[in-house]
């Protein structure tokens, strides 16, 4: 069984192909980088429309398949930026209609977790999902995921990127796989003292961002960068640990674009070791936004009979993880 997945929720257009053994046969992607400021949704959508067909062709070539060999086509239906979501959905509808393949809409947040479960072999992990727009702590429940906690304002990635943009050290925000805020902190002996806001299993980053921007103007810049990522990562690990305590689960996964941070991985690994739970980092190419995770989650839905007709395909800019039915849980 082969499923092709299209990811287009934000700045990355990705096309992946997987089989029923969760083997990633292709995982092609291209990222839109704005000339200034944050993501411009319509510009990003134009980028996706330009690169999407190329990536579909390349993914099929890498996998050694023809479109006729596919069993289904999956696409990220939300949450995300409207113009970007619609671009990916149009591509998926066109492929499914032309080649007469079943079409499967997939929740982007769920896909991050499911590819991590497949890679790690974990059955019921607490999932720490950290990306540009999201920071969510969840775990499997009955036929859906339970959200234990989340950001009350901006996502962790948004915090780091906005700070870097405002102080002039980015874009690009990631160099050699390391965020520029982490790179900026190298050489600092201690972190700047910045506010730490955790409320139960929820957390807030906006106050931390404001304080860091103020500190940048009057304190050692390396210390400010150190304080920013150190504080933010500690907050995330704390709420993850609380979710483990509440759920009594023994596994944890780290997913999303910020999951590629080695420093954050080390903090989660240390917490996991102290609690006696299992943690395995997953490859960055599968932790970030990518088509393979959409393909794999689409395959799971396809096996459970969840498909839509091309004319009934939908996108949802707002689509909470805990609203999604997950029949295989």
From Swiss-Prot:
Keywords, comma-separated and alphabetical: Acyltransferase, Cytoplasm, Iron, Metal-binding, Transferase, tRNA processing
GO cellular component, one term: EKC/KEOPS complex
Catalysed reaction equations from the record: L-threonylcarbamoyladenylate + adenosine(37) in tRNA = N(6)-L-threonylcarbamoyladenosine(37) in tRNA + AMP + H(+)
Cofactor note: Binds 1 Fe(2+) ion per subunit.
GO BP terms in the entry: tRNA threonylcarbamoyladenosine modification
Coiled-coil annotated residue ranges, if any: none
Cofactor: Fe(2+)
Domain of life, per lineage: Archaea
Pfam families xrefs: TsaD
Binding site for Fe cation: 108, 112, 129, 289
Entry's localization field: Cytoplasm
GO molecular function: iron ion binding; N(6)-L-threonylcarbamoyladenine synthase activity
Summary of the function given for this chain in its UniProt record: Required for the formation of a threonylcarbamoyl group on adenosine at position 37 (t(6)A37) in tRNAs that read codons beginning with adenine. Is probably involved in the transfer of the threonylcarbamoyl moiety of threonylcarbamoyl-AMP (TC-AMP) to the N6 group of A37.
Family the entry assigns: Belongs to the KAE1 / TsaD family.
PANTHER family for the chain: TRNA N6-ADENOSINE THREONYLCARBAMOYLTRANSFERASE
Name of the protein in its database record: tRNA N6-adenosine threonylcarbamoyltransferase
Source organism of this protein record: Ignicoccus hospitalis (strain KIN4/I / DSM 18386 / JCM 14125)
């Amino acid at each position: 069984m082969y499923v092709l997945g299209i990811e287009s929720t934000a700045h990355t257009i990705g096309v992946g192909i997987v089989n029923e053994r969760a083997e990633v046969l292709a995982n092609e992607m291209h990222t839109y980088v704005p000339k200034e400021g944050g993501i411009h949704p319509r510009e990003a959508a134009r980028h996706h429309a330009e690169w999407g067909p190329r990536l579909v062709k390349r993914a099929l070539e890498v996998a050694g398949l023809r479109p006729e060999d596919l069993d289904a086509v999956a696409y990220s239906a939300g949450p995300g930026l409207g113009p970007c979501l619609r671009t990916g959905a149009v591509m998926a509808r066109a492929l499914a209609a032309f080649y007469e393949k079943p079409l499967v809409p997939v929740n982007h947040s769920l896909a991050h977790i499911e590819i991590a479960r497949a890679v790690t072999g974990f059955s019921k992990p607490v999932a720490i999902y950290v990306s540009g727009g999201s920071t969510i702590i969840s775990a499997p429940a009955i036929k859906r995921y339970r959200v234990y906690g989340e950001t009350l304002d901006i996502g962790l990635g948004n915090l780091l990127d906005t700070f870097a943009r405002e102080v002039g050290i980015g874009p690009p925000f990631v160099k050699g796989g390391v965020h520029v805020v982490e790179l900026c902190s190298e050489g600092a002996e201690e972190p700047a003292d910045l506010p730490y806001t955790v409320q139960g299993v929820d957390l807030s980053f906006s106050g931390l961002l404001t304080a860091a921007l103020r500190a940048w103007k009057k304190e050692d810049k390396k210390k400010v960068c150190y304080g920013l990522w150190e504080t933010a990562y500690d907050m995330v690990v704390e709420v993850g640990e609380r979710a483990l305590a509440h759920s009594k689960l023994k596994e944890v996964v780290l997913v999303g674009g910020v999951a590629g941070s080695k420093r954050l991985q080390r903090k989660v690994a240390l917490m996991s070791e102290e609690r006696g739970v299992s943690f395995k980092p997953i490859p960055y190419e599968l932790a970030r936004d990518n088509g393979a995770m959409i393909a794999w989650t689409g395959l799971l839905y396809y096996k459970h009979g969840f498909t839509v007709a091309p004319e009934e395909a939908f996108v949802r800019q707002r689509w909470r993880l805990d609203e999604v039915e997950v029949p295989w849980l």
